[in-house]
């Protein structure tokens, strides 16, 4: 699977916002990956949203990833699925998805990231890098040193996640991340499109450091 050579902006849908409208704004702002994530929505709603978001990503030459729900990804023709540590192993997901779709895996340690690559993940999400309020009772942040160390050992893209905002996006890229994954940095901005555009600019600056 080929990923963009420029830093990737993965925007994850916010459960408090209409996902299709939010996805459209993020894509106009330059998101290269749109991930549909909603832990409480019904399968029917996830299918409906996926079928609406997928053509939007095609219009913007972006990738569409479904969080956790392998069945939804398969049913709607999504580009891939993002799995957590408690979900199906990447090896099993690959048997179901086939060789051409993307599998991402959430990781929080160097060992988890290396294991995900060994099991056939196409990219890893790594973090959380900074303190974040998006998860209940989160573990301490792993920090940029662990990010730099882990990224140097992987041959697949590492997308940093957790507490990433405009003011630290450049530093994350300069530490070796292939991209960032965000929710609130885009969803809490009055204009998600402008927020996404600003993050893209900061990441491009980070490549020059």
UniProtKB/Swiss-Prot annotation:
Cellular component GO terms held in the UniProt record: cytoplasm
Catalytic activity: 2-[(2R,5Z)-2-carboxy-4-methylthiazol-5(2H)-ylidene]ethyl phosphate + 4-amino-2-methyl-5-(diphosphooxymethyl)pyrimidine + 2 H(+) = thiamine phosphate + CO2 + diphosphate; 2-(2-carboxy-4-methylthiazol-5-yl)ethyl phosphate + 4-amino-2-methyl-5-(diphosphooxymethyl)pyrimidine + 2 H(+) = thiamine phosphate + CO2 + diphosphate; 4-methyl-5-(2-phosphooxyethyl)-thiazole + 4-amino-2-methyl-5-(diphosphooxymethyl)pyrimidine + H(+) = thiamine phosphate + diphosphate
Source species, domain of life: Bacteria
Pathway stated in the Swiss-Prot or TrEMBL entry: Cofactor biosynthesis; thiamine diphosphate biosynthesis; thiamine phosphate from 4-amino-2-methyl-5-diphosphomethylpyrimidine and 4-methyl-5-(2-phosphoethyl)-thiazole: step 1/1
Record keyword Magnesium present: yes
Keyword Endoplasmic reticulum tagged: no
Binding site for 4-amino-2-methyl-5-(diphosphooxymethyl)pyrimidine: 35-39, 67, 106, 135
Disulfide linkage: none
Cofactor: Mg(2+)
Function noted in UniProt: Condenses 4-methyl-5-(beta-hydroxyethyl)thiazole monophosphate (THZ-P) and 2-methyl-4-amino-5-hydroxymethyl pyrimidine pyrophosphate (HMP-PP) to form thiamine monophosphate (TMP).
Sequence similarity: Belongs to the thiamine-phosphate synthase family.
HAMAP family hit by this protein: TMP_synthase
NCBIfam families: thiE
Protein name, UniProt field: Thiamine-phosphate synthase
Species this protein is from: Chlorobium phaeovibrioides (strain DSM 265 / 1930)
């Amino acid at each position: 699977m080929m990923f963009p050579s420029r830093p990737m902006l993965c925007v994850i849908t916010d459960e408090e916002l209409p996902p299709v409208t939010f996805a459209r704004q993020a894509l106009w702002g330059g998101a290269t990956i749109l991930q549909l994530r909603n832990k409480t929505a019904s399968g029917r709603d996830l299918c409906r949203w996926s079928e609406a978001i997928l053509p939007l990503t095609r219009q913007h030459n972006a990738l569409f990833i479904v969080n956790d729900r392998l069945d939804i990804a398969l049913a709607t023709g999504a580009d891939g699925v993002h799995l957590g540590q408690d979900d199906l192993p990447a090896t099993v997901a690959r048997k179901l998805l086939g060789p051409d779709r993307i599998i991402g895996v959430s990781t929080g340690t160097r060992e988890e990231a290396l294991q995900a690559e060994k099991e056939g993940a196409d990219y890893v999400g790594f973090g959380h890098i900074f303190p974040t309020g998006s998860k209940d009772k989160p573990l301490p942040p792993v920090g940029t040193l662990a990010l730099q160390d882990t990224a140097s050992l992987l041959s697949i893209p590492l997308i940093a996640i957790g507490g990433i905002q405009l003011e630290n996006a450049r530093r994350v890229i300069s530490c070796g991340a292939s991209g960032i994954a965000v929710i609130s940095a885009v969803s809490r901005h009055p204009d998600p499109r402008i927020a996404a555009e600003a993050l893209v600019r900061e990441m491009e600056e980070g490549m020059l450091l």
